[in-house]
Amino acid sequence: MINNEPFPSADSASILTTSTSNNSLMSYNHQPQLSINSVQSLLEPVTPPPLGQMNNKRNHQKAHSLDLSGFNQFISSTQSPLALMNNTSTSNSANSFSPNPNAASNSTGLSASMANPPAILPLINEFDLEMDGPRRKSSHDFTVVAPSNSGVNTSSLIMETPSSSVTPAASLRNFSNSNNAASKCGVDNSSFGLSSSTSSSMVEISALPLRDLDYIKLATDQFGCRFLQKKLETPSESNMVRDLMYEQIKPFFLDLILDPFGNYLVQKLCDYLTAEQKTLLIQTIYPNVFQISINQYGTRSLQKIIDTVDNEVQIDLIIKGFSQEFTSIEQVVTLINDLNGNHVIQKCIFKFSPSKFGFIIDAIVEQNNIITISTHKHGCCVLQKLLSVCTLQQIFKISVKIVQFLPGLINDQFGNYIIQFLLDIKELDFYLLAELFNRLSNELCQLSCLKFSSNVVEKFIKKLFRIITGFIVNNNGGASQRTAVASDDVINASMNILLTTIDIFTVNLNVLIRDNFGNYALQTLLDVKNYSPLLAYNKNSNAIGQNSSSTLNYGNFCNDFSLKIGNLIVLTKELLPSIKTTSYAKKIKLKVKAYAEATGIPFTDISPQVTAMSHNNLQTINNENKNPHNKNSHNHNHNHNHNHAHNNNNNNNQKSHTRHFSLPANAYHRRSNSSVTNNFSNQYAQDQKIHSPQQIMNFNQNAYPSMGAPSFNSQTNPPLVSHNSLQNFDNRQFANLMAHPNSAAPIHSFSSSNITNVNPNVSRGFKQPGFMMNETDKINANHFSPYSNANSQNFNESFVPRMQYQTEGANWDSSLSMKSQHIGQGPYNQVNMSRNASISNMPAMNTARTSDELQFTLP
């Protein structure tokens, strides 16, 4: 093998002797290789063997391009580096012109020089030798030399000084092209002196008169664009350059706006143009605002133009470009959702007055464009910015369209933010609260169990609390502390909706507390921080304050609210063991404890204790709820066994372990046994023949004045989930406890059979087993919901019985007289709401189930 390394050669004997001694020395000094993870390698770093010695390994082919073994000659050589280089060139020239027949001596010639170690290492600049002789240097000759092994064509990187026939702009463009070509080939321009060439070219262009410059070519060049921007920034030349540039680029202004480099010059020029010049330029481009806005370069220029407009004439020209004469409604919607165009629309929103927003609002309210815009990432942001600055009339116009398409927005990943944004606008409370509740009440439970709509439900509940508590704090403060609050109609609607929402959450507690998203809405309703002023206890002065308005009976509302929220807290506490394996069980428990601390009731007393009832009393209650087909005979036996077990618990200790089924709602085992669902549906069909539907809740007109809104009909729109069978409750002991919160709680005062606000003379006309989530695969056959998605659970009407009440022979208390009230208008069939007909027949919790019920729950 012929070695062409640039090192001096020696005679054969010297080569053999030196090579042998050097190899023995290297083998003796070589340290064994250690693993990089070994302890010794960390304590004593190991020097790897020379690359030349590694070539002796078997089955290893030497890579000539990586052969650095000859570099060791610099360490052992006594000659100067320049002498080595001279010898190398002599040796290489001899080898290149006369082949050496003795390859062995030539291959060992590298190690011969190691006998003469150099005194010093070579400096970097000592290698910068002119191989081809001295080079002529001239101020008009700029030649770039590329390395021979770089693979770059040297001729493509040569740039000479332009002759008199070439314009300066063309010279700059040629340099720019050569510079780009060099960068594409992986060549570093700085290593070849390109910066000097650029400086020289720019100096020559700067020396030319301003009238002789080609502004069009300079504006579309990377360096020429920077050159002109600097000229504009120079105070002495700014006005002259502006006028000359304006005259040349006026016919090509649209092209410059869309140019990758020209758009920067346009943005800079906007700061220096006069009002007349800017108006003329806007006149040339306003018919093309759509094309400019969607362009990645044009959007920057147009935003700068909008940001620097000086008068109404310029604004009107831009608005005219967005009118339907030049830009259609579909194109405006495209701009709102476009990556580049949405910034132009936002610039118009923040720069122009609301009277100029007509083209945006017209596009939003056209047909179903509100869905297209609100459910888009960029459109959602534009719509929120628009709602934050436009007038109340414009907000109302948009909000009506949003409410119209509410089902398509509330559970969308972007659309739900629009609804939440509307809830923050106080001026819309007079109609928005009632409209939202009218459209969402029948689906409130299911919406609470969906990922995005659950955020809207939480926001809605917090809104109700904020309106009512704000009224209370303002009403009980002094005259100097009172501020503007919502009107009486808004407060009335908020009170009615809040009480109804608590009832809906109570009957659907089994579903909400086990759902991965529904538990968040439940926690919001349970959080005592939201309603601490509403608790009707003597120690809470705000709850017993005098009302400033005679039309509002706040005392009655506080009593009703305290009873309902107390009932919900008790039932939630009762269900805590069933969710102990979930991640949010501790948070819900803390909410219950916070309620106990706020009301002064020990946490342990909140736990329900089912009272011992005699067999005769239980027989009487069951007979009231019994139908002619004896469908409740099983419930009678179950309740009898249940009370018998609790009678024994009074004397004996309860079993140390009770099995609870605590799987989240989304993880429940789905059964394929259709007989279970069919039997349950048949039983419900018998109920339908016997019991006529009654009002769920009716708001007392004396306590809450009518708002003139239609009522809801539960028969037409059944609730989403089963209204669990509840025991008959009596509120007398709980009301007595509220009157004396500091006294000792009587035994069984917090029984789940004593909390709910229901008149004991009223009997409920239905009995049914609890809702079983493991049958959700059978309840989705015939029911369609506009809020359904992959994460939702639809509930079949045949499986979910409607809430019905039987009021045969019932005499409602005169203080709680029922009169149908209304909560707002809506397209759905309404459900009559009653503020005092609270939830009954809740199934007993934590009790042993019969074999018939276990077939629903056991996996």
From Swiss-Prot:
Residues 86-108 have a biased composition (Low complexity). GO terms for cellular component: cytoplasm. Present with 1240 molecules/cell in log phase SD medium. The keyword Protease does not apply. Keywords: Cytoplasm, Phosphoprotein, Repeat, RNA-binding. CDD domains: Pumilio (cd07920). RNA-binding protein involved in post-transcriptional regulation. Negatively regulates expression of HO by binding to the 3'-UTR of HO mRNA. Predominantly binds to mRNAs encoding chromatin modifiers and spindle pole body components. Recognizes and binds to 5'-TGTAA[CT]A[AT]TA-3' in the 3'-UTR of target mRNAs. Multicopy suppressor of POP2 mutation. Required for high temperature growth. The modification Phosphoserine is found at S662, S834, S838. Residues 628-645 have a biased composition (Basic residues). Pumilio repeats lie at residues 209-247, 248-283, 284-320, 325-362, 363-400, 401-438, 439-474, 503-539. InterPro entries: ARM-like, ARM-type_fold, PUM-HD, Pumilio_RNA-bd, Pumilio_RNA-bd_rpt. Residues 188-596 form the PUM-HD domain. One of its GO terms (biological process) is negative regulation of translation. This is Suppressor protein MPT5. The keyword Repeat applies. It is found in: Cytoplasm. Residues 85-108, 620-658 are annotated as: Disordered. SUPFAM superfamilies: ARM repeat. GO terms for molecular function: mRNA binding; protein-macromolecule adaptor activity. Pfam families: PUF.
